[in-house]
Amino acid sequence: MIKQRTLKNIIRATGVGLHSGEKVYLTLKPAPVDTGVVFCRTDLDPIVEIPARAENVGETLLSTTLVKSGVKIATVEHLLSALAGLGIDNCYVELSAAEVPIMDGSAGPFVFLIQSAGIAEQDAPKKFIRIKREVTVTDEDKRATFVPFDGFKVTFSIDFDHPVIKGRSQETVIDFSSTSFVKEVSRARTFGFMRDIEKLRAMNLALGGSMDNVIVVDDFKILNEDGLRYEDEFVKHKVLDAIGDLYLLGNSLIGEFKGHKSGHGLNNKLLRELLSQKDAWEVVTFEDAGEAPISYLKPVLA
């Protein structure tokens, strides 16, 4: 049986919010079977819990923000991407502020935290959402689509008319049966344009952004001394974001996601569209791990 997974131990980290610039304390805790991923604002009294579900997404400007009764938790996508990539079904995420810390701008530090905490299998079957037919949403020239696929695959293309990005691969196809999320995707950092950063700061956004957590690009070049981690780090980061956004379905996916210039808003619109079309998907479990189109590393090795 492919089993549900949680963490073995509690683990903590500290960082800053990308947009708020505030110091944030993050704690990841094991959670019982069928809990899902639940974010908790421990700085509030009483503590506010917000399940990481598509219907709880309230804002998608520059990051994915969960909202419940006016309480917000911003920038959840990189942590969710790490949880999805390692197949963690159940986890409590405690935060001391309204934003998940940005760490280095990728999902890498969260992968490290989860692996350091250890992964525990639970005595219940892991539930997958299997795509049964195509579902598409569009917004002008942006597009996001689910199609049936026996496994998990992400196809993504971006279209930036910028000398730095134009000269690199702007399209990628990643089949996770043969490609490691941890090695090939998790370390891709968020990127921003120098000309936009001033505007964002004027709006009280990107206050925690720096060369330590963003690939900064001016009109001609990458400003970070160490350059890029992957040749196609820009489009790979969009894949990382999409995997985090898709995990708001609450389960791992069996299917293919295709995105063209899609961002957090369109990704969420696609999830809501899929969930509303009950004949387009089904929940499946696997008694025999050998029959599953998706496999996960054994926890000892993960």
Swiss-Prot record:
InterPro entries, A to Z: Ribosomal_Su5_D2-typ_SF (IPR020568), UDP-acyl_GlcNac_deAcase (IPR004463), UDP-acyl_GlcNac_deAcase_C (IPR011334), UDP-acyl_N-AcGlcN_deAcase_N (IPR015870)
Cofactor entry: Zn(2+)
GO molecular function: metal ion binding; UDP-3-O-acyl-N-acetylglucosamine deacetylase activity
Enzyme category, top tier: hydrolase
Keyword Lipid biosynthesis in annotation: yes
Entry EC number(s): 3.5.1.108
GO biological process: lipid A biosynthetic process
GO CC terms: membrane
The keyword rRNA-binding is assigned to this record: no
Pfam family, one: LpxC
Keywords per UniProt: Hydrolase, Lipid A biosynthesis, Lipid biosynthesis, Lipid metabolism, Metal-binding, Zinc
Catalytic activity: a UDP-3-O-[(3R)-3-hydroxyacyl]-N-acetyl-alpha-D-glucosamine + H2O = a UDP-3-O-[(3R)-3-hydroxyacyl]-alpha-D-glucosamine + acetate
Active-site residues from the entry: 264 (proton donor)
Residues that coordinate or bind Zn(2+): 78, 237, 241
Listed pathway(s): Glycolipid biosynthesis; lipid IV(A) biosynthesis; lipid IV(A) from (3R)-3-hydroxytetradecanoyl-[acyl-carrier-protein] and UDP-N-acetyl-alpha-D-glucosamine: step 2/6
Coiled-coil regions listed: none
Function: Catalyzes the hydrolysis of UDP-3-O-myristoyl-N-acetylglucosamine to form UDP-3-O-myristoylglucosamine and acetate, the committed step in lipid A biosynthesis.
Cited NCBIfam families: lpxC
HAMAP family: LpxC (MF_00388)
Family as reported in the entry's similarity comment: Belongs to the LpxC family.
Name under which the protein is recorded: UDP-3-O-acyl-N-acetylglucosamine deacetylase
